[in-house]
A protein has these predicted regions:
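Eukaryotic scaffold repeat domains enriched in small/polar residues
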Residues: 1-102
Length: 102
């Protein structure tokens, strides 16, 4: 699966989805990152912490960080209610972020 500009961490499979943290999109000093959610066809359906997924001729366009949500997300864990837990690397000792499903 081609993920332009995305340095990814450990993938997690939940149901028909594949999720992973995008630890950085530029360089290690920019402290950015987001999550990626792919469907069963390996198409990105969401970039929490980033721009909406966009394709041109079936090729994913490099996503843009939203400048606020994460700081080098290093992993993603999912509970039975589909809440997401996101630890962050080199983030100034922040606690993991919990994203509650709505």
């Amino acid at each position: 699966v081609q993920m332009p500009g995305c340095y990814i961490c450990r993938p997690v499979i939940k149901g028909e989805y594949l999720l992973f943290a995008v630890i950085v999109t530029k360089d290690w000093g920019t402290y950015d990152g987001m999550l990626a959610v792919l469907n069963k066809n390996n198409k990105v359906v969401s970039f929490p912490g980033g721009s909406a997924p966009s394709y041109v001729d079936k090729t994913l366009i490099k996503p843009k960080y939203d400048q606020i949500s994460f700081r080098n997300p290093h992993d993603v864990c999912i509970d039975d209610d589909w809440n997401l837990y996101v630890p962050q690397w080199n983030s100034g000792k922040t606690y993991p972020v919990k994203l509650t499903r709505i």
